[in-house]
Design a protein with these regions (language model features):
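Sec/Tat signal peptide C-region and signal peptidase I cleavage site
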Residues: 16-20
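Stable alpha-helical elements in mature extracytoplasmic
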Residues: 305-312, 413, 417, 421, ...
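Sec-exported extracytoplasmic/periplasmic mature domains
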Residues: 314-325, 426-427, 431, 467, ...
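Extended catalytic-interface subdomain
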Residues: 361, 366, 372-380, 421-429, ...
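Conserved catalytic/binding loops enriched for acidic/polar residues
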Residues: 438-802
Length: 802
């Protein structure tokens, strides 16, 4: 008993100090972490102790977000500029337990959720997880909705792929590893339907980087903006693509219980335009849209050019009127509002880029589910004016005296800017290039003052038709007949893409309505034809060409070039200029001549295309006739194989190069490469089986007769003729030796043997010409001495003699 008492007393004595410490600890004031209030928006944003948090509403879980990352500022000589797109993704948040996951939605399949196959589609389209974070806390807003707080500092202060510069761009910039310690989040702003994250990112530069920043410091720093934009809860009704009308597209595989094959669906990209007054719209009245399309002008744009950029935007209203809308599109100055950001994905902006690149471009970002265009940031390079000066002087200098000076007046340059603005805005509205539009105009109409001023020289501003180079000085054609404009095709294309069908129950019903409209329109006039992007060997759909006959149009073009080449020293004179301006202007003349050559050469092996639906009669593909191909080859003989001495005979040309022909050999090379390529000979052969085809042996014989006429005449060969003859021999040898077995091989061989026979029989008193012929014979013997090699062979011998 006594023992127990002693032990109990000892226990009490030992516990007393511990209890005292506990009471003392409890008596201290309790510290609770107080965070700054969150800023409300798409995601509420909170900043605390150098960390950023997103509060993600329960209602946004699973909702698709368009996430665009753009450059804000870039290093000197980067070749990319503030406002340009670096990355675009569709992401969504997913909650599992106490973790929040960010997934990328790779939208390549579509199915009706009520179909049984929807489960199979889901099981074969697992979306990748790109980020996860523990839910830091859960809060409730004033409406009772739950918001999950997650730290996102690591999401943005890293080089995560969905926000990163892609590998091609990194290679172009010469940058390598991301340097986290030299990177940071600048700020995060949040708005009702979007959240904007601005970061500063530093990368180690590669050893051979061309960027001055990388060369000087080993580092390259860029400022980036990532926009999270909530995609519409109610997707827009999509419009099915039709190859007879030129729109950009979104694509996906469509699965359905009621199909016997998977459909690769293409839907066109376009803004969501809905009439404010449906009943008035049905009555055929022009109606304003519920939401106007608005483009803001970058405040960095020189003030004198802003009105012309705006006019180029608003010129599209005439096309939207064809679709039943008025005041559908507008251009506005950027407001003096600190809450607005040029990188904000809610706003479409014409960004003015301080670049020496002579160009402009018109991209857009669209909802991959439907093609709905959400925004656009047009890239307008400052030096596009150099390109406009070059085009206009060399194409219109003979018919517009305003073009006859080294620097245009502001009104002329402004109107040129206006036309390019309209072209680029056309792209942002969803329209592709229509390189076939100019072929709807007969060449002689391009010289008809009354006709061309009323109708324009091309049916579409989306063509690369530039200016009316066919018009001659005596035609007295004004700017209206020289400049492109929003024209018949453009109005039709906007009507097709933006016409609202209030009574159509679904996209399929709209497709059938539009098909009938398209058939009727194409019957009405060839001016509504869409010719594609000019990459399919169709002579009617080429870049930089005019009219329905390349030989006639080029004849008129050359007549003007012969005048211009004499005048460019006078038109481009600048005191103290060391012929820099003169050489640049001369190169533009040569380049224009090269375009005329290519326009004609495309006829050889060319094939017209005209897409048709099942209801339309006729063929889709029609090879160019034998007569037209022979006429094209004869034209090339007259204008290329026979040296265009007028290009090099002006005295000033010897100020530009010690051998004037060096300045124009490129014209010959381009044409000969086209005429003697394996592809051209192959297509001539395959098309020859069609009615009225150009037989390949006839083609090769004609070509050899033209190029090697000197072997019969006995004349001394010029530097120009030698160059072309060597090029033909080298190319035919290549077509026979290097390419895989195909139609071109026997005809390339036949061509070499024809040339060999001519050279062996040739008689000339000129020793230099005899030496040249002997060299060509040796090159042919070398080329034919071995067996033909298959594509990919390690043998690299090129019997080009050059």
């Amino acid at each position: 008993m006594k023992k127990f008492f002693v032990l109990a007393l000892a226990a009490v004595m030992m516990a007393a100090p511990a209890e005292a410490k506990k009471k003392k600890k409890n008596a201290a004031p309790v510290k609770t972490e107080v965070r700054t209030p969150a800023k409300n928006g798409l995601f509420n944003v909170q900043f605390h102790k150098d960390k950023y948090y997103f509060q993600i509403p329960d209602s946004l879980l699973g909702r698709l977000l368009m996430v665009n990352t753009r450059f804000v500022s870039t290093p000197v000589d980067a070749g990319v500029y503030g406002g340009e797109l670096a990355n675009s993704q569709v992401l969504y948040w997913e909650k599992r337990g106490k973790q929040m996951y960010l997934r990328a939605n790779l939208y390549d399949t579509r199915t009706d959720s009520t179909d049984a196959i929807a489960l199979a589609v889901k099981n074969s389209t697992q979306d990748p997880i790109v980020f996860n974070a523990k839910i830091d806390s859960t809060v409730t807003d004033s409406t009772g909705a739950k918001l999950y707080s997650v730290e996102v500092t690591g999401l943005f202060n890293s080089d995560i792929d969905v926000f990163a510069i892609n590998s091609n761009m990194k290679s172009r910039l010469g940058i390598a590893n991301y340097k986290k310690d030299l990177s940071y989040i600048d700020y995060i702003h949040t708005f009702p339907i979007n959240t904007e994250v601005v970061t500063v990112r530093t990368f180690a530069s590669k050893a051979l980087t061309k960027l001055p920043a990388g060369q000087a410091t080993g580092n390259v720093t860029l400022k980036m903006n990532t926009s999270f934009v909530l995609l519409p809860k109610e997707p827009m009704k999509f419009r099915t693509f039709d190859p007879r009308v030129g729109y950009f597209t979104e694509e996906f595989n469509e699965f359905s219980d009621n199909q016997q094959e998977v459909t690769r669906k293409k839907v066109v990209t376009r803004y969501r335009l809905v009439p404010k007054d449906i009943e008035a719209y049905k009555r055929g009245e022009l109606v304003e849209p519920v939401k106007q399309i608005v483009y803001y002008i970058d405040p960095a744009t020189p003030a004198k050019w802003r009105p012309y950029l705006k006019a180029g935007v608003e010129d599209w209203n005439v096309a939207f009127e064809a679709a039943g809308f008025k005041n559908a599109i507008a251009a506005k100055d950027w407001p003096n509002d600190s809450t607005m950001s040029l990188e904000d994905a809610r706003y479409s902006v014409i960004r003015y880029l301080a670049s020496d690149i002579p160009n402009a471009y018109g991209p857009h970002c669209s909802d991959p589910r439907t093609g709905e265009i959400l925004e656009s940031h047009v890239g307008w390079y400052h030096n596009v004016m150099q390109l406009l000066h070059s085009w206009y002087q060399v194409q219109a200098g003979c018919v517009d005296k305003r073009a006859q000076k080294p620097e245009f007046d502001d009104e002329l340059m402004g109107q040129l800017i206006r036309f390019v603005s309209s072209h680029e805005i056309g792209h942002t509205l969803g329209l592709r290039h229509n390189m076939g539009a100019s072929s709807a105009t007969p060449v002689e109409k391009l010289r008809d003052k009354a006709w061309v001023e009323e109708h324009g020289h091309t049916a579409s501003i989306m063509d690369y038709a530039r200016f009316n180079y066919v018009a001659q000085p005596e035609d007295n054609i004004s700017e209206k007949g020289i400049f492109p404009r929003i024209n018949d095709y453009d109005k039709w294309a906007i009507n097709w893409g933006y016409r609202y069908f209030p009574d159509a129950k679904d996209a399929e019903e709209e497709r059938l309505i539009l098909n009938k409209m398209t058939i009727a329109k194409l019957k009405e006039s060839p001016r509504y034809w869409f010719g594609g992007e000019g990459s399919d060997n169709d002579p009617h759909a080429q870049t930089e060409d005019l009219g329905d006959d390349a030989m006639k149009a080029s004849d008129y073009g050359i007549k003007n070039l012969k005048r211009i080449v004499k005048k460019i020293p006078e038109w481009n004179y600048k005191e103290g200029d060391m012929d820099v301006q003169l050489k640049f202007a001369y190169k533009n003349v040569v380049a224009q001549m090269g375009r005329y050559m290519r326009h004609v050469a495309t006829n050889i092996s060319g094939c017209y295309h005209d897409f048709k639906s099942a209801e339309q009669d006729g063929v889709v593909y029609t090879p160019v006739s034998r007569a037209t191909q022979k006429r094209a080859l004869a034209w090339i003989n007259a204008n290329v194989f026979n040296e265009p001495t007028w290009l090099v005979s002006e005295p000033y040309v010897r100020r530009l190069n010690r051998v004037p022909e060096n300045l124009i050999f490129g014209i010959a090379d381009d044409v000969v490469d086209k005429l003697t390529s394996a592809m051209t000979i192959n297509l001539v052969s395959k098309h020859s089986y069609m009615p009225d085809g150009y037989k390949p042996m006839e083609y090769i014989t004609d070509l050899v007769n033209y190029v090697f006429s000197s072997t019969v005449s006995g004349k001394k060969t010029s530097l120009w003729t030698k160059h072309i003859q060597r090029k033909v021999v080298a190319n035919l040898a290549k077509a026979w030796r290097v390419n895989m077995v195909d139609e071109q091989k026997p005809y390339a061989l036949a061509g070499l043997n024809m040339i060999k026979g001519r050279l062996q029989k040739a008689r000339t008193a000129d020793a230099d010409t005899r030496a040249h012929y002997a060299d060509l014979l040796m090159q042919i013997r070398i080329a034919l001495s071995g067996m033909p090699q298959m594509s990919g062979s390690s043998a690299n011998s090129r019997p080009d003699g050059m």
